[in-house]
Amino acid sequence: MSGKAERLKDEGSRLQVTAAGATAGLISRFVIAPLDVVKIRLQLQHHSLSDPLLHQRRAEIIGGGPVYKGTLPTIRHILRTEGLTGLWKGNIPAELLYVSYAAVQFTTYRSITQFLQAAFPKDQNKQLPPSVESFIAGASAGGVATAVTYPLDLLRTRFAAQGVERVYPSLVQALKTIYASEGVTGYFRGLGPGLAQIIPYMGTFFCVYETLRPRLSKLELPYSSGSAVAGVLASVMAKTGTFPLDLVRKRIQVQGPTRGMYVHKNIPVYDGGMVKTVATIVRREGVRGLYRGLTVSLFKAAPASAVTMWTYERALKLYIRLGAAGPGRKEGV
Protein backbone atom coordinates (compact mmCIF):
# COMPACT_ATOMS: atom_id res chain seq x y z
CA MET A 1 0.00 0.00 0.00
CA SER A 2 1.91 2.94 1.23
CA GLY A 3 5.26 3.55 -0.22
CA LYS A 4 6.63 4.54 3.19
CA ALA A 5 4.90 2.10 5.50
CA GLU A 6 5.93 -1.52 5.24
CA ARG A 7 3.68 -2.83 7.98
CA LEU A 8 -0.09 -3.00 8.02
CA LYS A 9 -0.25 -1.72 11.60
CA ASP A 10 1.46 1.56 10.69
CA GLU A 11 -1.10 2.69 8.12
CA GLY A 12 -4.28 4.78 8.32
CA SER A 13 -6.18 6.60 11.05
CA ARG A 14 -8.43 4.75 13.49
CA LEU A 15 -11.55 5.80 11.58
CA GLN A 16 -10.07 4.66 8.26
CA VAL A 17 -8.96 1.37 9.81
CA THR A 18 -12.43 0.77 11.30
CA ALA A 19 -14.19 1.50 8.00
CA ALA A 20 -11.78 -0.68 6.02
CA GLY A 21 -12.18 -3.53 8.52
CA ALA A 22 -15.98 -3.40 8.30
CA THR A 23 -15.82 -3.39 4.50
CA ALA A 24 -13.49 -6.38 4.44
CA GLY A 25 -15.66 -8.31 6.88
CA LEU A 26 -18.82 -7.70 4.86
CA ILE A 27 -17.34 -8.94 1.59
CA SER A 28 -15.37 -11.82 3.08
CA ARG A 29 -18.36 -13.30 4.89
CA PHE A 30 -20.58 -13.43 1.81
CA VAL A 31 -17.86 -15.14 -0.23
CA ILE A 32 -17.07 -17.88 2.28
CA ALA A 33 -20.56 -18.43 3.78
CA PRO A 34 -21.15 -21.88 2.18
CA LEU A 35 -17.85 -23.26 3.48
CA ASP A 36 -18.61 -21.88 6.93
CA VAL A 37 -21.94 -23.72 7.04
CA VAL A 38 -20.27 -26.95 5.88
CA LYS A 39 -17.51 -26.58 8.47
CA ILE A 40 -19.98 -26.10 11.31
CA ARG A 41 -22.08 -29.11 10.23
CA LEU A 42 -18.97 -31.32 10.15
CA GLN A 43 -17.71 -30.03 13.50
CA LEU A 44 -21.00 -30.81 15.23
CA GLN A 45 -21.11 -34.38 13.89
CA HIS A 46 -19.58 -36.86 16.30
CA HIS A 47 -18.47 -40.47 15.81
CA SER A 48 -17.90 -43.30 18.24
CA LEU A 49 -14.27 -44.41 18.48
CA SER A 50 -15.22 -48.00 19.38
CA ASP A 51 -17.86 -48.26 16.63
CA PRO A 52 -17.38 -45.77 13.75
CA LEU A 53 -20.70 -46.85 12.17
CA LEU A 54 -22.73 -46.38 15.35
CA HIS A 55 -23.59 -42.77 14.53
CA GLN A 56 -24.84 -43.74 11.08
CA ARG A 57 -27.00 -46.60 12.39
CA ARG A 58 -28.51 -44.38 15.08
CA ALA A 59 -29.24 -41.70 12.52
CA GLU A 60 -31.06 -44.23 10.35
CA ILE A 61 -33.03 -45.70 13.27
CA ILE A 62 -33.98 -42.67 15.38
CA GLY A 63 -33.57 -39.85 12.90
CA GLY A 64 -30.36 -38.48 14.36
CA GLY A 65 -29.77 -36.29 11.36
CA PRO A 66 -27.78 -36.71 8.16
CA VAL A 67 -24.30 -38.20 8.19
CA TYR A 68 -21.86 -35.96 6.37
CA LYS A 69 -18.83 -37.53 4.68
CA GLY A 70 -16.50 -34.80 3.51
CA THR A 71 -16.82 -31.32 2.09
CA LEU A 72 -18.29 -31.97 -1.37
CA PRO A 73 -20.79 -34.65 -0.24
CA THR A 74 -21.95 -32.28 2.50
CA ILE A 75 -22.48 -29.47 0.00
CA ARG A 76 -24.45 -31.81 -2.27
CA HIS A 77 -26.56 -33.04 0.65
CA ILE A 78 -27.42 -29.50 1.77
CA LEU A 79 -28.32 -28.48 -1.78
CA ARG A 80 -30.51 -31.55 -2.22
CA THR A 81 -32.37 -31.31 1.10
CA GLU A 82 -32.35 -27.57 1.89
CA GLY A 83 -31.78 -25.84 -1.43
CA LEU A 84 -29.21 -23.21 -2.36
CA THR A 85 -30.21 -20.96 0.53
CA GLY A 86 -29.17 -23.72 2.92
CA LEU A 87 -25.54 -22.84 2.21
CA TRP A 88 -26.16 -19.32 3.51
CA LYS A 89 -28.00 -20.27 6.69
CA GLY A 90 -27.22 -17.88 9.51
CA ASN A 91 -25.90 -15.30 7.07
CA ILE A 92 -27.59 -12.32 8.74
CA PRO A 93 -26.01 -12.81 12.19
CA ALA A 94 -22.82 -13.92 10.45
CA GLU A 95 -22.65 -10.74 8.35
CA LEU A 96 -23.23 -8.66 11.48
CA LEU A 97 -20.53 -10.71 13.19
CA TYR A 98 -17.95 -10.36 10.43
CA VAL A 99 -18.55 -6.62 9.93
CA SER A 100 -18.38 -5.78 13.63
CA TYR A 101 -15.60 -8.29 14.38
CA ALA A 102 -13.32 -7.04 11.61
CA ALA A 103 -13.96 -3.40 12.51
CA VAL A 104 -13.14 -3.99 16.19
CA GLN A 105 -10.21 -6.28 15.39
CA PHE A 106 -8.35 -3.96 13.03
CA THR A 107 -9.05 -0.90 15.19
CA THR A 108 -7.78 -2.66 18.31
CA TYR A 109 -4.76 -3.96 16.42
CA ARG A 110 -3.86 -0.42 15.37
CA SER A 111 -4.46 0.98 18.88
CA ILE A 112 -2.45 -1.71 20.69
CA THR A 113 0.39 -1.24 18.21
CA GLN A 114 0.48 2.50 18.88
CA PHE A 115 0.45 1.83 22.63
CA LEU A 116 3.35 -0.62 22.39
CA GLN A 117 5.35 1.75 20.21
CA ALA A 118 4.83 4.53 22.78
CA ALA A 119 5.64 2.24 25.73
CA PHE A 120 8.74 0.82 24.06
CA PRO A 121 10.15 3.74 22.03
CA LYS A 122 12.60 3.08 19.23
CA ASP A 123 14.77 6.10 20.03
CA GLN A 124 15.50 4.72 23.50
CA ASN A 125 16.49 1.29 22.21
CA LYS A 126 13.51 -0.27 23.99
CA GLN A 127 11.57 -1.20 20.87
CA LEU A 128 10.06 -4.68 20.86
CA PRO A 129 11.03 -7.02 18.02
CA PRO A 130 8.49 -6.54 15.20
CA SER A 131 7.30 -10.15 15.44
CA VAL A 132 6.66 -9.84 19.19
CA GLU A 133 4.85 -6.54 18.70
CA SER A 134 2.67 -8.07 15.99
CA PHE A 135 1.88 -11.14 18.11
CA ILE A 136 0.86 -9.10 21.16
CA ALA A 137 -1.23 -6.66 19.12
CA GLY A 138 -2.85 -9.47 17.11
CA ALA A 139 -3.62 -11.59 20.18
CA SER A 140 -5.12 -8.58 21.98
CA ALA A 141 -7.18 -7.61 18.92
CA GLY A 142 -8.54 -11.13 18.54
CA GLY A 143 -9.45 -11.40 22.22
CA VAL A 144 -11.23 -8.03 22.35
CA ALA A 145 -13.11 -8.56 19.07
CA THR A 146 -14.23 -12.05 20.11
CA ALA A 147 -15.49 -10.93 23.52
CA VAL A 148 -17.38 -7.95 22.08
CA THR A 149 -19.06 -9.84 19.24
CA TYR A 150 -19.43 -13.30 20.81
CA PRO A 151 -23.26 -13.42 20.97
CA LEU A 152 -23.32 -12.98 17.19
CA ASP A 153 -20.85 -15.85 16.83
CA LEU A 154 -23.08 -18.09 18.90
CA LEU A 155 -26.12 -17.13 16.81
CA ARG A 156 -24.17 -17.78 13.60
CA THR A 157 -23.36 -21.30 14.79
CA ARG A 158 -26.89 -22.12 15.89
CA PHE A 159 -28.47 -20.86 12.68
CA ALA A 160 -25.95 -22.76 10.54
CA ALA A 161 -26.69 -25.92 12.55
CA GLN A 162 -30.41 -25.77 11.75
CA GLY A 163 -31.80 -28.23 9.25
CA VAL A 164 -35.04 -28.03 7.29
CA GLU A 165 -36.95 -27.70 10.57
CA ARG A 166 -35.95 -24.37 12.06
CA VAL A 167 -35.15 -24.02 15.74
CA TYR A 168 -35.25 -20.23 15.51
CA PRO A 169 -37.54 -18.66 12.86
CA SER A 170 -35.78 -15.28 13.04
CA LEU A 171 -32.86 -13.45 14.61
CA VAL A 172 -35.10 -11.53 17.01
CA GLN A 173 -36.89 -14.71 18.05
CA ALA A 174 -33.55 -16.41 18.67
CA LEU A 175 -32.45 -13.60 20.98
CA LYS A 176 -35.73 -13.81 22.91
CA THR A 177 -35.71 -17.61 23.15
CA ILE A 178 -32.11 -17.84 24.35
CA TYR A 179 -32.69 -15.15 26.97
CA ALA A 180 -35.90 -16.79 28.20
CA SER A 181 -34.51 -20.33 28.43
CA GLU A 182 -30.80 -19.78 29.15
CA GLY A 183 -30.48 -16.27 30.52
CA VAL A 184 -27.82 -13.73 29.59
CA THR A 185 -25.08 -16.33 30.03
CA GLY A 186 -26.65 -18.31 27.19
CA TYR A 187 -25.33 -15.73 24.73
CA PHE A 188 -21.79 -16.51 25.89
CA ARG A 189 -21.72 -20.32 25.84
CA GLY A 190 -18.25 -21.43 24.77
CA LEU A 191 -16.60 -18.05 25.30
CA GLY A 192 -13.76 -19.65 27.29
CA PRO A 193 -12.53 -21.98 24.52
CA GLY A 194 -13.34 -19.21 22.03
CA LEU A 195 -10.85 -16.87 23.70
CA ALA A 196 -8.36 -19.69 24.27
CA GLN A 197 -8.47 -20.41 20.53
CA ILE A 198 -8.59 -16.91 19.07
CA ILE A 199 -5.83 -15.30 21.16
CA PRO A 200 -2.98 -17.55 19.94
CA TYR A 201 -4.63 -17.80 16.51
CA MET A 202 -4.73 -14.05 15.84
CA GLY A 203 -1.35 -13.53 17.49
CA THR A 204 0.22 -16.10 15.16
CA PHE A 205 -1.75 -14.84 12.16
CA PHE A 206 -0.63 -11.22 12.42
CA CYS A 207 2.93 -12.20 13.35
CA VAL A 208 3.27 -14.35 10.22
CA TYR A 209 1.31 -11.91 8.04
CA GLU A 210 3.39 -8.88 8.99
CA THR A 211 6.57 -10.90 8.37
CA LEU A 212 5.53 -12.14 4.92
CA ARG A 213 3.70 -9.05 3.63
CA PRO A 214 6.69 -6.76 2.90
CA ARG A 215 8.62 -9.64 1.35
CA LEU A 216 5.78 -10.71 -0.94
CA SER A 217 5.05 -7.12 -1.97
CA LYS A 218 8.49 -7.01 -3.60
CA LEU A 219 7.56 -9.87 -5.94
CA GLU A 220 5.05 -7.71 -7.85
CA LEU A 221 2.41 -10.44 -7.96
CA PRO A 222 -0.62 -9.90 -10.25
CA TYR A 223 -3.56 -7.87 -8.90
CA SER A 224 -1.39 -6.78 -5.95
CA SER A 225 -2.10 -10.19 -4.46
CA GLY A 226 0.87 -10.27 -2.10
CA SER A 227 -1.44 -9.43 0.81
CA ALA A 228 -3.80 -12.25 -0.20
CA VAL A 229 -0.99 -14.81 -0.39
CA ALA A 230 0.38 -13.67 2.96
CA GLY A 231 -3.11 -14.00 4.43
CA VAL A 232 -3.50 -17.55 3.12
CA LEU A 233 -0.16 -18.74 4.49
CA ALA A 234 -0.65 -17.04 7.85
CA SER A 235 -4.17 -18.43 8.19
CA VAL A 236 -3.23 -22.03 7.39
CA MET A 237 -0.41 -21.99 9.95
CA ALA A 238 -2.50 -20.39 12.69
CA LYS A 239 -5.69 -22.39 12.07
CA THR A 240 -4.00 -25.81 12.11
CA GLY A 241 -2.47 -25.16 15.51
CA THR A 242 -5.62 -23.91 17.22
CA PHE A 243 -8.36 -25.91 15.47
CA PRO A 244 -9.27 -28.29 18.34
CA LEU A 245 -10.38 -25.37 20.51
CA ASP A 246 -12.50 -24.03 17.65
CA LEU A 247 -14.28 -27.39 17.45
CA VAL A 248 -14.79 -27.43 21.23
CA ARG A 249 -16.30 -23.95 21.07
CA LYS A 250 -18.80 -25.02 18.40
CA ARG A 251 -19.89 -28.09 20.37
CA ILE A 252 -20.45 -26.03 23.51
CA GLN A 253 -22.32 -23.31 21.62
CA VAL A 254 -25.16 -25.67 20.71
CA GLN A 255 -25.65 -26.99 24.24
CA GLY A 256 -28.71 -26.03 26.23
CA PRO A 257 -32.45 -26.67 25.77
CA THR A 258 -32.24 -26.73 21.96
CA ARG A 259 -29.33 -29.22 21.76
CA GLY A 260 -31.44 -32.03 20.25
CA MET A 261 -33.29 -29.82 17.76
CA TYR A 262 -30.55 -29.11 15.22
CA VAL A 263 -29.72 -30.99 12.04
CA HIS A 264 -27.72 -33.42 14.23
CA LYS A 265 -30.33 -34.61 16.74
CA ASN A 266 -27.91 -36.56 18.92
CA ILE A 267 -25.24 -33.99 19.77
CA PRO A 268 -23.66 -35.23 23.04
CA VAL A 269 -23.97 -33.30 26.29
CA TYR A 270 -20.86 -31.31 27.19
CA ASP A 271 -21.42 -29.61 30.53
CA GLY A 272 -18.03 -29.69 32.21
CA GLY A 273 -16.20 -26.78 30.60
CA MET A 274 -13.43 -26.65 28.02
CA VAL A 275 -10.95 -29.15 29.51
CA LYS A 276 -13.60 -31.76 30.28
CA THR A 277 -15.10 -31.36 26.81
CA VAL A 278 -11.70 -31.99 25.20
CA ALA A 279 -11.23 -35.09 27.37
CA THR A 280 -14.73 -36.36 26.49
CA ILE A 281 -14.19 -35.94 22.75
CA VAL A 282 -10.81 -37.71 22.89
CA ARG A 283 -12.28 -40.58 24.93
CA ARG A 284 -15.26 -41.07 22.61
CA GLU A 285 -13.79 -40.22 19.22
CA GLY A 286 -10.02 -40.31 19.63
CA VAL A 287 -7.64 -37.44 18.93
CA ARG A 288 -8.94 -37.32 15.35
CA GLY A 289 -12.26 -36.19 16.78
CA LEU A 290 -10.67 -32.86 17.71
CA TYR A 291 -9.83 -32.25 14.06
CA ARG A 292 -13.21 -33.09 12.55
CA GLY A 293 -13.84 -30.55 9.78
CA LEU A 294 -10.21 -29.37 9.63
CA THR A 295 -9.95 -29.79 5.85
CA VAL A 296 -12.98 -27.67 5.04
CA SER A 297 -11.93 -25.24 7.78
CA LEU A 298 -8.62 -24.68 6.00
CA PHE A 299 -10.42 -24.40 2.66
CA LYS A 300 -12.60 -21.76 4.28
CA ALA A 301 -9.92 -19.96 6.31
CA ALA A 302 -7.48 -19.61 3.43
CA PRO A 303 -9.79 -17.78 0.99
CA ALA A 304 -11.47 -15.91 3.86
CA SER A 305 -8.14 -14.51 5.03
CA ALA A 306 -7.06 -13.80 1.46
CA VAL A 307 -10.29 -11.92 0.68
CA THR A 308 -10.27 -10.14 4.04
CA MET A 309 -6.70 -8.89 3.87
CA TRP A 310 -6.80 -8.04 0.15
CA THR A 311 -10.10 -6.16 0.54
CA TYR A 312 -8.93 -4.49 3.74
CA GLU A 313 -5.80 -3.12 2.13
CA ARG A 314 -7.65 -1.94 -0.98
CA ALA A 315 -10.39 -0.31 1.13
CA LEU A 316 -7.87 1.31 3.48
CA LYS A 317 -5.96 2.69 0.52
CA LEU A 318 -9.20 4.17 -0.85
CA TYR A 319 -10.16 5.74 2.49
CA ILE A 320 -6.69 7.20 2.92
CA ARG A 321 -6.94 8.77 -0.53
CA LEU A 322 -10.38 10.17 0.26
CA GLY A 323 -9.04 11.56 3.53
CA ALA A 324 -6.09 13.16 1.78
CA ALA A 325 -8.38 14.74 -0.80
CA GLY A 326 -10.74 16.18 1.82
CA PRO A 327 -10.26 18.63 4.69
CA GLY A 328 -7.99 17.87 7.63
CA ARG A 329 -4.53 16.45 7.83
CA LYS A 330 -3.15 14.37 5.01
CA GLU A 331 -1.81 10.89 5.45
CA GLY A 332 0.72 9.08 3.33
CA VAL A 333 -0.63 6.87 0.57
UniProtKB/Swiss-Prot annotation:
<keyword id="KW-0472">Membrane</keyword>
<feature type="transmembrane region" description="Helical; Name=3">
    <location>
        <begin position="135"/>
        <end position="155"/>
    </location>
</feature>
<comment type="function">
    <text>Mitochondrial transporter that mediates uptake of thiamine pyrophosphate (ThPP) into mitochondria.</text>
</comment>
<dbReference type="InterPro" id="IPR023395">
    <property type="entry name" value="Mt_carrier_dom_sf"/>
</dbReference>
<keyword id="KW-0677">Repeat</keyword>
<feature type="transmembrane region" description="Helical; Name=2">
    <location>
        <begin position="96"/>
        <end position="112"/>
    </location>
</feature>
<comment type="similarity">
    <text>Belongs to the mitochondrial carrier (TC 2.A.29) family.</text>
</comment>
<keyword id="KW-0999">Mitochondrion inner membrane</keyword>
<feature type="repeat" description="Solcar 3">
    <location>
        <begin position="222"/>
        <end position="318"/>
    </location>
</feature>
<feature type="transmembrane region" description="Helical; Name=6">
    <location>
        <begin position="293"/>
        <end position="310"/>
    </location>
</feature>
<dbReference type="GO" id="GO:0030974">
    <property type="term" value="P:thiamine pyrophosphate transmembrane transport"/>
</dbReference>
<feature type="transmembrane region" description="Helical; Name=1">
    <location>
        <begin position="17"/>
        <end position="35"/>
    </location>
</feature>
<feature type="repeat" description="Solcar 2">
    <location>
        <begin position="129"/>
        <end position="215"/>
    </location>
</feature>
<feature type="transmembrane region" description="Helical; Name=5">
    <location>
        <begin position="221"/>
        <end position="238"/>
    </location>
</feature>
<dbReference type="Pfam" id="PF00153">
    <property type="entry name" value="Mito_carr"/>
</dbReference>
<keyword id="KW-0813">Transport</keyword>
<dbReference type="InterPro" id="IPR018108">
    <property type="entry name" value="Mitochondrial_sb/sol_carrier"/>
</dbReference>
<keyword id="KW-0496">Mitochondrion</keyword>
<dbReference type="GO" id="GO:0005743">
    <property type="term" value="C:mitochondrial inner membrane"/>
</dbReference>
<feature type="repeat" description="Solcar 1">
    <location>
        <begin position="12"/>
        <end position="115"/>
    </location>
</feature>
<dbReference type="InterPro" id="IPR002067">
    <property type="entry name" value="Mit_carrier"/>
</dbReference>
<keyword id="KW-0812">Transmembrane</keyword>
<dbReference type="GO" id="GO:0015234">
    <property type="term" value="F:thiamine transmembrane transporter activity"/>
</dbReference>
<keyword id="KW-1133">Transmembrane helix</keyword>
<protein>
    <recommendedName>
        <fullName>Mitochondrial thiamine pyrophosphate carrier 1</fullName>
    </recommendedName>
</protein>
<feature type="transmembrane region" description="Helical; Name=4">
    <location>
        <begin position="190"/>
        <end position="209"/>
    </location>
</feature>
